[in-house]
Amino acid sequence: MSGGLDVLALNEEDVTKMLAATTHLGAENVNFQMETYVYKRRADGTHVINLRRTWEKLVLAARAVVAIENPADVFVISSRPFGQRAVLKFAAHTGATPIAGRFTPGAFTNQIQAAFREPRLLIVLDPAQDHQPITEASYVNIPVIALCNTDSPLRFVDIAIPCNTKSSHSIGLMWWLLAREVLRLRGVLPRDQRWDVVVELFFYRDPEESEKDEQQAKEQAVVPAKPEVVAPVHEDWNETLEPVASWAEDTAPPAAPAAAPAFGAPPAQEEWSAQVQDEWSTTAAAPAAATAAPSWGGSAQDWSAA
């Protein structure tokens, strides 16, 4: 499938990641169309998937995605919670359109409803769970790429990528590998360069566990600002004790304003006394003038004389 090119061949690092994520472990049951991807069966009944065939189908799926001119015409769907985070991350890095959660029936066939879409390529997580979009895609001739386990039905599936779809780590790793291969085929990411996006970002995380981690991080968080701020403040206070003595010495001169009133008071008092005496002298003349009232009596004498 990879054309026999060494550049597209499976390397040891990717194989190690697949084995660590249990991508090679299938189900106990096997579909007759998936028998070609099974390497052998273990003693406990679990079928082992051939990872070489997995990588070949993954490269083929990446080539199909790159062939679409507009990345938004590629729809990625996952109704299972374990694959919704991986689908959203894949769409964010490749430009595809994600549908995480419940698929609206008739989105590909009913042109009347507002959710009507016309994708050119469809990528689903599990054909058994996402059977509705696969069935509608068959009505409008949309090619379908699916991550399939050994017991997954392959009806209306054009490209099947055999892998373990029961493990959240395996699901996240397969979407991460597919996104990396798409970026490499587009020329965005060189093949001799490591992708700076880690695989853990594609893994499913339990909301309760994430909340607990956030609470623990808040509890363990220490505020170093308080001890750092208090120490320099004490040092500043100790240093400012010396200027305080100079301020005490400077407080003596303010006594001069108190002497100012003493300087202005005597002349003010002398002037007031002088003015008071002058006024009294002037007012004393008024009673003297008032003593001239006997003139009225003189007039009265004139009246008696008359």
Curated annotation (Swiss-Prot):
It is found in: Cytoplasm. Belongs to the universal ribosomal protein uS2 family. Required for the assembly and/or stability of the 40S ribosomal subunit. Required for the processing of the 20S rRNA-precursor to mature 18S rRNA in a late step of the maturation of 40S ribosomal subunits. GO terms for biological process: ribosomal small subunit assembly; translation. SUPFAM superfamilies: Ribosomal protein S2. InterPro entries: Ribosomal_uS2, Ribosomal_uS2_C, Ribosomal_uS2_CS, Ribosomal_uS2_euk, Ribosomal_uS2_euk/arc, Ribosomal_uS2_flav_dom_sf. Its main location: cytoplasm. Component of the small ribosomal subunit. Mature ribosomes consist of a small (40S) and a large (60S) subunit. The 40S subunit contains about 33 different proteins and 1 molecule of RNA (18S). The 60S subunit contains about 49 different proteins and 3 molecules of RNA (28S, 5.8S and 5S). Interacts with ribosomal protein S21. Keywords: Cytoplasm, Ribonucleoprotein, Ribosomal protein. Residues 209-229, 250-306 are annotated as: Disordered. The keyword Ribosomal protein applies. One of its GO terms (cellular component) is cytosolic small ribosomal subunit. Residues 257-268, 280-300 have a biased composition (Low complexity). One of its GO terms (molecular function) is structural constituent of ribosome. This is Small ribosomal subunit protein uS2.
